Amino acid sequence: MSTEKDYVVADIGLADFGRKEITIAETEMPGLMSCRAEFGEAKPLKGARITGSLHMTIQTAVLIETLVALGAEVRWASCNIFSTQDHAAAAIAAAGVPVFAIKGESLEDYWVYTDKIFQWADGGLSNMILDDGGDATMYILLGARAEAGEDVLSNPHSEEEEILFAQIKKRLAASPGWFTKQRDAIKGVTEETTTGVNRLYQLSQKGLLPFPAINVNDSVTKSKFDNKYGCKESLVDGIRRGTDVMMAGKVAVVCGYGDVGKGSAASLSGAGARVKVTEADPICALQAAMDGYEVVLLEDVVSSADIFITTTGNKDVIRIDHMRQMKDMAIVGNIGHFDNEIEVAALRNLKWTNVKPQVDLIEFPKGNRIILLSEGRLLNLGNATGHPSFVMSASFTNQTLAQIELFTKPGQYENKVYILPKHLDEKVARLHLDKLGVKLTQLSEEQAAYIGVKPQGPFKSDHYRY
């Protein structure tokens, strides 16, 4: 492990390999490269000190270097202990950006690294957060609440919360008052994923959100592309790399049929699996049924299916009682943000055999075994390398525009959660059309007036669902 200077990566010697893959990814990320061309000279992020907590992949490296090209200073950690690509982290560290990320890092190190991305060499403070899942934001807000005398650290509900609370207490002891100062210095946060967005909305509803936030996840060019088309390619990739199992003919259960569930079901179906769906929402259940999937109760298929994938963003979706009933060598994995969709903690007292990194064989007393991927964390990033560069370009272009929006317009946004305006959503889509050879039909003035839009757009109302 290399710990010199202001970074922690697995092997700085991987930097050249990482740089080669970054160069390839740049050709597949036209949105980010267009942002560099459009904003690089003006440097709208000059003065921004961005704390980034997002999967440290090759694609994220292109995002980081785009933010730097636009004038920002950046410190970065991964938002998942298994999602880092070590050569990507090495390349970014070698380029002079402080990064703290190792594939397979411990939970203790994860929260130490989350603390480090707020610790600037000159003792200054971050003024922007770019988050995925909300951990960096929650770290600061929990610490500030503790400094205010609230009893928020005395009752951890999980092993991870216990570790998080210990790290907060360590920083409280070392730097009294720091959390409050850091919270007050933040101009805004941009949030990448459904889980983190839900956290922000809950804070906003309670009046506890201390700075403006942009919900990047619900930009159409994020949720309808990254969540759906990204999962459509990366889920099966992760299962194959982890298990080498043939999916054709297997029975696969997808828990949840939101955008991630839709992409996951399509991924498995495209590989030849016979897909069944579980769903609590009647609208999503009807969509699944009309897309041709059998919508079932998990309890009715748990002993007969071969593959189980959670996509819900909820907790305890697959519980230990379910896993006890699974057939021998059933594959269990998650593609939602956190690891609590599968009741992994309840499996810890069973016999675990590590097959290879992020693949574990867990044996129940009656002799049946399950294959657990990435310990219940994101299997497409733990067992594979996540979504392809092209679809991540759309997501990360939204992130870049959102960072510019909040940083350059202080005072224009209240302490609420916002979505990028429709014209920017359409702009992100436009930036990716040439790469695919797409030609847009041009509306005449008369046609545009007939449907109540401008010929150049936006073409849909904010409530249009796509």
Swiss-Prot record:
GO terms for biological process: L-homocysteine biosynthetic process; one-carbon metabolic process; S-adenosylmethionine cycle. One of its GO terms (cellular component) is cytosol. One of its GO terms (molecular function) is adenosylhomocysteinase activity. InterPro entries: Adenosylhomocyst_ase-like_sf, Adenosylhomocysteinase-like, Ado_hCys_hydrolase_NAD-bd, NAD(P)-bd_dom_sf, S-Ado-L-homoCys_hydrolase_CS. NAD(+) binds at residues 193-195, 227, 256-261, 279, 314, 335-337, 380. The keyword Iron does not apply. Its EC number is 3.13.2.1. Keywords: Cytoplasm, Hydrolase, NAD, One-carbon metabolism. It is found in: Cytoplasm. Its cofactor is NAD(+). PROSITE patterns: ADOHCYASE_1, ADOHCYASE_2. It catalyses: S-adenosyl-L-homocysteine + H2O = L-homocysteine + adenosine. It comes from the Bacteria. Coiled coil: none annotated. Binds 1 NAD(+) per subunit. Pathway: Amino-acid biosynthesis; L-homocysteine biosynthesis; L-homocysteine from S-adenosyl-L-homocysteine: step 1/1. Substrate binds at T57, D132, E192, K222, D226. May play a key role in the regulation of the intracellular concentration of adenosylhomocysteine. Belongs to the adenosylhomocysteinase family. NCBIfam families: ahcY (TIGR00936), PRK05476.2-3 (NF004005). This is Adenosylhomocysteinase.
